[in-house]
Amino acid sequence: MAPDTRAVLLTLYRYQEAFSALDSNAAHAVWPSVDVKALDRAFDQLEQQTFNLQGCNVTVSGTRADASCSGSAIYARKVGNTAVHEEPRQWRFTLQQRGGQWLIDRVDVR
């Protein structure tokens, strides 16, 4: 595996861990353009959340990269229906290398 591909996958792992920990600051560290206040509000609605990104396909072109991952989101809300839900998800990431590290520019989730 090429070093840049490995570095992109590490960034995606950090994204997964940040969202699983409901940690908006950690999410901002890998996705600088994310709206931290909106993310805090969303995280405040959740009792727990786990993102499972699997089978990520990464394409690196110079200082840009695209990645698509399948997986699931498991979550429970604090209010209302507090049952644990699991939903399949597809993630598409656009990343850019800045200052020697790969950062997320855009995320599309379906």
What do these predicted ranges mean?
Residues 9-10, 17-72:
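Short solvent-exposed beta->alpha transition segments
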Residues 1-3:
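Compositionally biased, proline/threonine/alanine/serine-rich low-complexity intrinsically disordered stretches
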Residues 11-12, 80:
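Residue-level detector of alpha-helix boundaries and kinks
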Residues 64-110:
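Exposed beta-sheet edge and beta->alpha loop/turn motif
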